[in-house]
């Protein structure tokens, strides 16, 4: 695919994905690559611009990430951020100093708005600093274009070579001019057009899938979640009836969810859809099991068995569709972060399944996946469907999973979601759900003492689920939810609201 490309070179900073998202907000395609990417690979990718991220290291550290000096002679504009700024200076024979005092938080910065980087900006504004080391002497050919009280070189440039460095973090909201500055780099320095869009992305993917698949058969494990749904629709638009979707209904879905998935994909999109009703099978395997990790493992393994059985019935299948998205690739593919997790999509399908993969969304962030879904005509409600764990309600019913507990959780959750929607909050809260702690408490209903279940409500705000804060839902909404659940759901006499952020808590209770 011919598209303008910006490379975000990863030095282990916490904001790497945010930098990439900021670039893409300007309709410019970018990829995150490790700092170990060779000069040859960079030349082959032919980027129009390069951004160095921040990172936790000092340029003087024994194992500090480095890049080859030749990178700065390729004629490609480079923007270094924080560690990336210091690394540029260090690599080009400037000087980096380690002071006793660090600079952290909101800081006033003086900007030289004659620089292309700060064009049309105020001379003084607010930025976000998070550093110890700083540049005490810029390399030959560079000049200082920003300062703070504590940092003599808050930004530098070699305009002739289109090399720029900033000590602050333009990608975060606290740098008030940050988005504008990145825009200046992309369009004033790199001279990009900004013509990458979700509609062009979908068209290109459909064309590529047609060419890749030919007349072969394809299967997709459809969960009804946003990622697998959008992936399935893209592939279906490319190859039509050559695609068969397998929807394993394990009986652990939310209220009416299985029927909704079947209706949308079978009726609206006219897909070949096999719905496997495996509720009894999954509940049988979960009987007597209360440990959350065992529950997850049992559900994952059983899902694989059911999927394999159905795939074999279809005969000669060449390709498997997965809803892998870009954060999955980044999290499993870079080697600079402190913690790396392996990526297992669709319940951890076995590696010995002899299918070639089709991953149409592997270049997109979640918000971009939603945008493609809207472009493809997937119902708005499904595109904005709440994140839902693979094991489903099994990990929202704490302790042993039974049909009775699932029914209670399902009804309470449906009421909570309904009232959030009525209040116009469904797209303002990242995730919200009801769960059933393994707790019963004393209550009074009428003139009788009761001893019934407690329902916990959980709602969080977040941008990426890595961290989250509890949602400040208006009291009147919580009051209505509480009254409705207690009155409409049997065996419930108490409602609690979880006011814990992540960390220390996780979003899910199990």
Curated annotation (Swiss-Prot):
UniProt-recorded Gene Ontology molecular function terms: ATP binding; GMP synthase activity
EC number: 6.3.5.2
UniProt keyword annotations, A-Z: ATP-binding, Glutamine amidotransferase, GMP biosynthesis, Ligase, Nucleotide-binding, Purine biosynthesis
Catalytic activity: XMP + L-glutamine + ATP + H2O = GMP + L-glutamate + AMP + diphosphate + 2 H(+)
One GO CC term on file: cytosol
Oligomer status and interactors: Homodimer.
Name of the protein: GMP synthase [glutamine-hydrolyzing]
Protein source organism: Clostridium botulinum (strain Loch Maree / Type A3)
Gene: guaA
